[in-house]
From Swiss-Prot:
The gene is Csrnp2. This is Cysteine/serine-rich nuclear protein 2. Binds to the consensus sequence 5'-AGAGTG-3' and has transcriptional activator activity. May play a role in apoptosis. The keyword Phosphoprotein does not apply. The modification N-acetylmethionine is found at residue 1. Residues 480-492 have a biased composition (Basic and acidic residues). Residues 1-52, 480-534 are annotated as: Disordered. Disruption phenotype: Mice display no obvious defects in development, hematopoiesis or T-cell function. Deletion of Axud1, Csrnp2 and Csrnp3 together causes partial neonatal lethality, suggesting that they have redundant functions. One of its GO terms (molecular function) is sequence-specific DNA binding. Keywords: Acetylation, Activator, Apoptosis, DNA-binding, Nucleus, Transcription, Transcription regulation. Residues 31-40 have a biased composition (Low complexity). Residues 42-52 have a biased composition (Polar residues). It comes from Mus musculus (Mouse). Its main location: nucleus. PANTHER family: CYSTEINE_SERINE-RICH NUCLEAR PROTEIN 2, TGF-BETA INDUCED APOPTOSIS PROTEIN.
Amino acid sequence: MDAFSGSGLKRKFDDVDVGSSVSNSDDEMSSSDSADSCDSLNPPTTASFTPTSILKRQKQLRRKNVRFDQVTVYYFARRQGFTSVPSQGGSSLGMAQRHNSVRSYTLCEFAQEQEVNHREILREHLKEEKLHAKKMKLTKNGTVESVEADGLTLDDVSDEDIDVENVEVDDYFFLQPLPTKRRRALLRASGVHRIDAEEKQELRAIRLSREECGCDCRLYCDPEACACSQAGIKCQVDRMSFPCGCSRDGCGNMAGRIEFNPIRVRTHYLHTIMKLELESKRQVSRPAAEEEPLPGAQSSQTQDFQEFIAENETAVMHLQSAEELERLKAEEDSSGSSASLDSSMESLGVCILEEPLAVPQELCPGLAAPILIQAQLPPGSSVLCFTENSEHPAASPMSSPSYLNSGPLVYYQVEQRPVVGVKAESGSEEGPASFPKEKDLSVFSLPVTSLVACGPSASAALCKPEVGKTSSLNKLLPEDCGLKEPESEDLHPSWSPSSLPFRTDNEEGCGVQNSQQSEDRTSEDSALELPLAV
């Protein structure tokens, strides 16, 4: 008996259904008792029947109140709300605590009812516009007082002037803000005789407080003067100096500081999209993998993952905030940009010329795009090539370009250790005075006619030295070039443009001249041996 009463109490606490009552449970129990008594008097004929215990009775499903075949509308009376904040004035609208009527519609009936209500609202709105136009016409846009205009009402506007039958009501918005006079009229029509006037002042204070956002601090927050710190809230920075103007290092708010980080948001978005796309690819490739395993599936997924990571990094780089960019720029200026410029120039074959040239595409296929700079680079650049004489005869349009005319070229290799330059016949050391004197330059002077273009057809011939040709650079130079053989090993230049293809006027072919000191070159010098665009 105790177990029976306990189970009954448990059902009352578990079942929240309003429709269930004690009589239903009593009926169920009485029917089950009668069934048990019948079974005891008349034993079942089938042996498979097993009586179920009342303690393991399944919980009844709650009846759902949501139905998708009909719409139930509850109607409430209007009251002064005290819960909403209008954009102006007081007398906020609300509704009563209990509804006064209920009505059910089918889906089609509700759609028709909504259309009728919308057309009626639209008709009233057009009447108000028509009445306002008549008043403005009588008062000449408000410049003249008119007694007739003051006496006009909505009843003076005929319904024949308003046609809303052929208007598509879905193109209009019907939840429009109401002015204060209209709200007060609706409240009086609903039976509200006394409207609280103090609500107007409260709503005004709320609107003023909402206009003030953040603190007025600039770069530095004093906890005793900061409005956010006095209110016990964190300073918030959505963008530069908005709404709080404090900086990251100058904020003294004891509650803390929150800064919107677009990089973090973008990173989270890209990671989420990446995970979803990888999961979808795995689901698509899973049936194919069960039938026939693919050896390159894992590598393709790894490649896709790396592509997503690269895209993520690229997107993050473009989302740097202004404050972070300024900080990075200051750090770069403090550390010095000469080293980064030198390292970037060492990885490129740079050709410096005094005049802009139209370089053909077949000049040097080894380089993706020849770089032509009309300026001087700081010390540490790899190879500098420019014309010594700025006075060149103008090349005709049909002849070869101006950079292939006769004229000496100078190749420089800037090194960290002192190197004696090549001396001319006059005994004076050659070298441009415009470069700094901390680093000596190794100079090789060649005529322009000794250079040939690195065409695709000549790439095989350029990679092999010709048999019987001397490897010395001076034998390829003209006799009037004025260069002398270095007397000692110390005077011999440590770098020669061996990878630069050239030819003399009396040679038919061209070959790459390998210097004797190629074995002594460092890895840095060997990396610089690229065909240069001249």
